[in-house]
Structure formats: structure tokens, C-alpha cells
Amino acid sequence: SSAAEDSGFIRAVRYGELEGRCIAYARSLGNLPANYLGAEEFSAYTEKLAAKLGATCRILDGMELKRQGFGGILAVNQGSAREAKLAVLTRECVPEQPFTALVGKGVLFDSGGYHLKSAEAMEGMKFDMCGAANVLEAFEILVREETKENIMAVLPLAENAIGPKACRMG
């Protein structure tokens, strides 16, 4: 085989390793217990990953979410004792060009709020954050593969819980 073929093969193996590692990590995030992985912990990991990748990460919380009009995230989260966050990661490589944005749902636990789910249905509700985990790891793959586009990952992180301030139906 030629050196060019070997080089292509090696690139493919390296890409497969990167993709496999990122998929496994997204799966690991999804498998964490909901009482361990809240918006605070998820956003802290997001900041560390962005720093490793040389990407920009901005975390909006509490008053900043309210000030900027993110009422949907706040409404879903208002029954929770934990604070909602919005993590926005960016990697700009072509100044003045638009961004391709990936958005991943990050409801870290979804009890259904006042529209309470059955115990059986609630078992898998920690997986409502897998959209955010998958987008975060897709962002990592794109950055590490040095895509030539401006990319952004938007991760709304909330918990839909029952509480005296929880959003009511109707």
C-alpha cells in the first residue's frame, strides 16, 4: 500500500477514535444520576471542555436569563431548587461570517412538573438532557477536526420539578 493510502487510513482511524470517545462521553453524561448532574455541574464541565478546545464559553444564569428574556428556560425550571443555566460555546475561525448553531435540549430531570409522570415513565427522565450532551460532544468533534466553519453550541440546562413555584398547566 502507498503512503497516501496509509495516511488516509490513519486519519480515518483517528477520526473513528475521536468520534467513539465523544459518543461514549455523551453516553456517560446521560447515565449519571440526576441528583449528581445538575445545571451547575453540566455548565462547569462545559467551561472546562471549552478551555481545553480553545473555544469560548458563556454561561448565563438567574438574573441574566431573566434580563435577556429567556422565560421558557426559567418557566421550566421554576419548580426546582437548582438554578437554570444556558451554556453557549463558540468557535470562530472565519470572522464576519455567520455561525452554524447546534442546539441541544438539556432538561436534566423531567418529573413532568404538575403534569406528573408515572414512576415507570419517570425512570428514564434523566435522559432528557441527552440532546445537550450529544450537541456538546458534536461540538468537540467539529473543533478537534478543525472544521472551517464558525460553530456554536447552545445548551439550555434546566430541571422540570414540582414545587411551590412550578409552572402550572393552562
Name each model feature, range by range:
Residues S1-L108, I141-E145, E149:
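N-terminal hydrophobic/helix-forming segments and targeting peptides
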Residues T46, T100-L102, H115-E159:
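Alpha-helical metal-binding/catalytic segments enriched in His/Glu/Asp
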Residues V76-S80, K117-K126, R168-G170:
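A glycine- and small-aliphatic-rich helix-loop capping segment at beta-alpha/alpha-beta transitions
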Residues F109-K117, I162-K165:
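Short acidic/His/Gly/Ser-rich catalytic and metal-binding motifs that mark active-site loops
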Residues L155-L157, I162-G170:
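A structural-propensity feature for long, helix-poor, extended segments
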